[in-house]
Structure formats: structure tokens, C-alpha cells
Amino acid sequence: MKKLYILLTVIIFSSISYSQFNQYPRPGQGQFTGGAGITWIDGQPNYTIALQPEVSFANWGVGLDLRLTFDPQGNLRKESFNDFSDYLSIIRYVRYGLKNDPVYIKLGALDYYTLGHGTIMYRYNNSPSFDNRKIGLVTDIDFGDFGFESIYSSFGEAGIVGLRGYVRPLHYTSWRAIPIISNLELGLTFAGDFNKNAGITAGQYNNITNKFESTTDKGSINIVGLDVGLPVISGSFADVTLYYDFNKIIDFGHGSATGVIAQFNPLGFVQASAKLERRFNGDHYIPSYFNSFYEIERFQITDKTTGSFTSKAALLAGLSNNDDGWYGELGVNALGLLNIIGSYQRLDKTPNSGILHIESEIAPEEAPFVLRAGYDKINIRNEKDLFTLDDRSYLFTEVGYKPYPFMVVSLVYNWTFTPVRDADDNIIGYEPQKRIEPRVYFVFPFSFEGS
């Protein structure tokens, strides 16, 4: 297992933490972070320079993320710019609007993106590695009577394409004025992965050529789905939607799900969200196939000497016994001081089917401290397996103190992934990577609106 230890003397940038909390500056405001430091990689000192400005104005937002790491000889670390997408990833994001706004467009890193009710794509992340950041595009537009959601995961290589179109058919009838039932929504979804490794189910690693040679390849993985949703409560106090989805993975199996999504704002200063879903899975079917770990799960070499590998397509092909399951999620935001969200899913009869996601943040604007944490784990076997760190885990923690309002002294720990490449520099998998960062950083907020 490769270990990467980082000590930053004066470093002024924040990590890629995939947090959903406080993602962007408020409209008319921005912040500039940047700095330089020393990084130890495999016992050798490397030198890091980083610039990360971010600004929001009206519905627009822009964030950049330039990170340069040089080895002791002054050469740029090759992992920093292996692919064309590495150059594009300097643009962390350009966006218009926010998710669930009438118009939402985002170009860049895609963190936790969901199509529809999430039974095909849920919390998908296109950049799970510091050394393999990607740039993609999402476009969601709601015209009132109809609309669509879409995603293109990466401009640097073939990847995931997804599109969900939906219509509110009763808006075209005399029932338009009837509360509740008039907002009935029907949707149709297509999502496919066109990456060259998406459909590999059998093969072997050639140690002479240092390349993986597939013997069975199903090609692209394509999923189509139909869904119906009904908002039974809609207002400032609460929003509650009932839904039913049916999905088919082409050349594999099918499944369905029914559930409820709710958001509550009863007192104004406490907000809560919840989701509960019952899943009915047929043979050769995986719900929420494109999840937050999909870029890791898609394909990876686990042992070059034996040629063993794992792929999601191989897992899909091997699921011969249907197994139903549950998914639950709960989130709370209290006074803007405490944010926490957690979710867990498991199949009824499959022992290693648990998937856990937790993230939390305590970062009051006026308080002298910062606490952040995020944790994801897949293929959980039992309760003892929940919090063991391995190649099925992602962890981010930050504990910080603010001696001044613009200065944070913190310790950051990341258990993430680094890409493994073959002789032709193609990514053939990922391996766990540890990053420890004692950090001093400065955040300079600014405003460009008139007083």
C-alpha cells in the first residue's frame, strides 16, 4: 500500500473533500486561498504551490484549483498532469444556479450528483482521486410543465452520459388547478458508461507487456428507467414526495424501487431531510449503479502477479440470486452551525452489501474552531466492518483553530485513492493513499457588491 505523508509549512488551500455543506460563497462574495509548502512523497521532499480563488455573483459561480508539485530535482510531478483532463481540472467549476433550481448548469468537478430519485445514479462523484481529477458537465432545466436533467462525466476520456426527461402531464389538462395531483410527474431516464473498462467481466494481466488483456467484454453499460413521482406536500413548512421507479440494465437484469423523499423546515432555524426506499432487485441488477464510488468500482487490478481484478460489470454478471433491500438517509442543519447527513443501505440476504455515507461539519462563522469529517464505505460485511479503513473506504477529517478570523491552523487527514497505470499510462485501477496535512491557511473573503 502506497503511503503519502504531507507536511505543509505554510499552506493556504483547502482539500478536495466532496462536502455538500457550504459549497459556494454567497452571491456577491468570494474568497481567495493560495500558498506554498513542502510535501513528503515516499520519503522525498516535494514542493507544492496552490492557488484556489472562488467567487459567486448573482446566480453564477466560478472556482479554480491550480496545484503544482515539484520533485527534489525541480521537475513537475508527473501525476499532476498525466491526462488532458488534468489541465482542464484547473477549472474546479463554473456554475449557474444550484441543484433543484429552475436552471442549474455546472462545468468541472461533479460532486454527489443525482439523476431523478437516485435509483440509477445517486451521489455520483467523477473525481475520487487527487491525482486523477476530471472535468464534466451537468445541465438541469425545469420549464414548469416539463424539464430534463443531464450529465457528461468527463471531457478527457469516454465516460458516463446520463439524461432524464420528465413531464407533468396534468398541467396540460383542466386538472392543472387541482392541488397535489396536478403535480404528478412522469420521467424517462437513460444512463450509460462508455469507458473502455466499463464492461470487462473476464481477463488476465500480462506481466511481460505490463497490460491487462480482457477476454470477455460486454462493452458499454446502459440503463433505462421509468419513474413516477407525486409531491403530496409542498410548502415552506415541508415538502414530501412519493415515487416509484422501474429500471432495466440492458443485457442484464431489472429492478424497481418505491419510497418517500421529505424535507422539513418547521421552525426556520432547523432544517431536516429524509429518504426511505424499499428496493426490489431482480437477477443481475444493482440499484443506484452509478454511485459515489463508481469510478473506483468500475475496474481495478487487485494483484498484478496473479492477474486478479475486480469490476462492477463482473459483479453485475455474477448476481444470479435476486435480493431485495432497504435504503435510508437523514440530514439535519441546525442554526447554520451544525450540518450532518448520513445514509445506509443493505440487501436482505447478501452479507457484504452494506454501503455507508456520513459527513458532518461544525464551522460557525464567528466561532474560533472548525470541525469537518466525511466517510464513505462500500461492501460492508457486518457492524465490525463499518469503520475499518481499506480499499473500500474514503475518509476526510479536519480539526482546526482560528487564532484570527481569516486564519485557520488545522490538521487534515485523508484516506483516498491514487491511480495505478499500465505501460501505456492507462489507468487500470486505484490503490488506497494516505494524506496527512498539518495546515496553516488563510481565507480572504471579499465582496464586490455596492454597500
Features from the language model and the residues they span:
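Surface-exposed loop and membrane-interface regions of Gram-negative outer-membrane beta-barrel proteins
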Residues: 62-93, 120
